[in-house]
Each structure stands twice: as structure tokens, then as C-alpha cells.
């Protein structure tokens, strides 16, 4: 049986993660979660950095597989450039490249990655606030400062 402290922590984490996901949906809506919709990547949303991230992903996706991993061969030809330098989240890019090739057409993961970031920030923010505030409502209210 779980003790009260671990049950409270789990509850705070999941409620904070839901709060983070809700904030994501309020800020960006559902459009970024459509992997076939890259309009928000090309047009930039709030900030313009995502255009660089998406361009790096597009170059990497079109590159042939080889060693070292995560090299976009179309940039800095003929040597290529690591997608880490384009901030295209190399681990996610490497894992999703085979999926993107199977799906074909437009494929972006930036929206889902951002949703996961919001949820994790909300969850861990609630846990951090829970260290200093009693109950469940007060840490979740403080969690709004994190997401």
C-alpha cells in the first residue's frame, strides 16, 4: 500500500501535468498536434526560433542514414551538420525519422514535443510547489507560475 506522501506526490504531479497540457491548449490550440500540419512551424508561433528547428528537421529527414547519427547532409555540404546545431531535438529526430519516412508527406513533431514539455513542467512545478505549500489546491495554484 502506498503511503500518503507518495500518493499526494503522484496526484500533484498528474494534476500539474494536466494543468500544463491545458495551458498548452489555451496558448496554441490543437493545430500544432496535427503532425501533417506544419503551418505553425513555417510561420512561427509567438517566437521565430521554431523555423530554424523545423528547417533542421527537414534537412535531416531528407538525409540518407549513416554514421555519425543525426547528421543533416544537405547543410554544410559535403560534410553535413549535426541537427543538434539547429536545435531540432536530436534524440526525438533520430527516433522519429523512420516513422516520418513511413508516413511520407509532411511530418512534424514540434507540437507534440512542446505539449510534453508543458506537461512535464506543470508536473514538476506542482511537485516543487508541493514541497512548500500544504494540500493540493495551493501547489496547483502556484504551479500556474511555472507553466
What are these regions (language model features)?
Residues 115-147:
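Membrane-embedded helix bundles of polyisoprenyl
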Residues 14-18, 112, 140-144:
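Hydrophobic alpha-helical transmembrane segments
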Residues 4-5, 80, 88, 144:
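Short linear motifs in intrinsically disordered/low-complexity regions
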Residues 24-121:
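Membrane-interface coil-to-helix junctions
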Residues 1-36:
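Start-transfer (signal-anchor) and selected internal transmembrane alpha helices
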Residues 7-10, 14, 107, 111-114, ...:
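Membrane-water interface of alpha-helical transmembrane segments
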